Regions:
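Active-site diphosphate/adenylate-binding microenvironment
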Residues: 140-223
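Thiamine diphosphate
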Residues: 66, 106, 114, 120, ...
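A short, gly/pro- and small-residue-rich
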Residues: 19-27, 82-102, 197, 342-358
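Glycine-rich, acidic loop regions that bind phosphate or pyrophosphate groups
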Residues: 37-138, 255, 318
Length: 365
């Protein structure tokens, strides 16, 4: 058998993280997660194949395309997870979707066998089964494809390398907030190393730019634990007033600002689909907008500031950030032309862009 489970946020909403983990370990069934289910287990869990979807990891997406039986639990398989090519999603699999909301099951874009049950009820009645050892080993091979590596950069720091190192240095039980802006979103979901008891928070329903700072404030107040926020320089300015909230309450939030000279994700879209005609995105080729230096913003609010400018200084600077008791802003200088590590591929044919399935994601050069 080649079964695969898609673990969604509904599992946590049902407070069934522990029983879900016991189930997959007893059955020895590999799983991938949605964005909202990414922190159900540590990244290192041997059955965790990664995060699926358009901003997800290539190994997880390949596992979905290769499996024979797919069980989606606590998710409704939204387009960010399946893309618009719903007829080519998990083409070799029989798909079952476990969801407590009948209306969502009735409006699925993917053809599934619906099971309108809560996660707890499903776990009570689920049959135990085992995956073939060869399939488990195949998923472990696919998981290796998720690794970031150490790509070369002309200057500054590759955001994926930075985030990989940073999240590995964080203690277990950290609350990690990812902003909804493109660069932070792709970087966060494709390179975060989640440890036991850590949380990964993001506005997954909206993927809203600028959501990171207010989410970090709320998460820190609610959890009372070390909180980090990964955010781009463009998104950083959208809710900058929250810096005063952070300063006023001396919240232990470590803000890592990816400075890629403006709106990199939009710039990348303009490059790929609009012939490189850049406007409203900042950077060397577009002077229509500008950004206040992050150092000046941190000084205005009286928050500690550090900067990472090279690959060699990543660990040292992150260490100094984590050693501080209160809030800190860490500016991470990244190339303005850095490509997304993995993204949905498109082929241009006769002036049209033809989308590709997620097992053929485009890899950064």
């Amino acid at each position: 058998m080649k079964p695969l489970i898609i673990a969604g946020r509904g599992i946590r909403l049902a407070k069934e993280q522990k029983r879900f983990r016991q189930f997959i370990e007893r059955c020895q069934v590999p799983f991938v997660s949605t964005w909202g289910g990414a922190d159900l287990t540590p990244t290192d869990h041997p059955l965790n194949t990664g995060i699926l979807g358009m901003c997800g990891q290539i190994g997880a997406n390949k596992a979905v395309q290769e499996c024979a039986n797919l069980i989606a639990v606590g998710t409704h398989l939204a387009i960010p997870h399946t893309t618009t090519l719903t007829d080519k999603f998990a083409p070799n699999a029989k798909i079952m979707c476990v969801n407590i909301d009948q209306d969502q099951l009735a409006n699925m874009n993917v053809k599934v066998t619906p099971w309108c049950k809560g996660v707890s009820e499903w776990l009570d009645s689920a049959l135990f089964f085992h995956a073939e050892r060869s399939w488990i080993e195949r998923c472990l091979e696919l998981k290796k494809m998720n690794e970031v590596g150490r790509p070369k950069v002309a200057y500054g720091v590759n955001s994926y390398v930075f985030n990989d190192i940073m999240t590995r240095m964080l203690p277990a039980g950290t609350c990690m907030v990812i902003d909804g802006g493109g660069t932070a979103l792709y970087t966060g979901f494709q390179s975060s190393h989640i440890k036991e008891g850590s949380r990964l928070i993001c506005s997954t329903g909206m993927s809203a730019m600028g959501s990171g700072l207010p989410e970090a404030v709320g998460a820190c107040f609610a959890s009372g634990i070390l909180t980090t926020c990964l955010i781009g320089d463009g998104s950083f300015m959208l809710n900058i007033q929250e810096l005063q909230t952070i300063k006023h309450h001396n919240l232990p939030i470590k803000i890592f600002v990816i400075n890629n000279d403006g709106y990199l994700a939009i710039r990348d879209t303009q490059k790929g689909f609009l012939g490189g005609r850049h406007t409203g995105v900042g950077g060397d080729k577009d002077k229509s907008i500008s950004f206040t230096p992050i150092l000046r913003q941190s000084l205005a609010y009286g928050i500690d500031f550090v900067r990472i400018t090279s690959m060699n200084s990543i660990e040292e600077v992150i260490g100094s950030v984590l050693d501080r008791d209160g809030p800190c802003i860490c500016e991470v200088i990244c190339p303005g032309d850095q490509e997304m590590r993995w993204r949905q591929g498109f082929i241009e044919e006769n002036g049209k862009f033809i989308p590709q399935t997620l097992d053929n994601m485009k890899e950064a050069a």
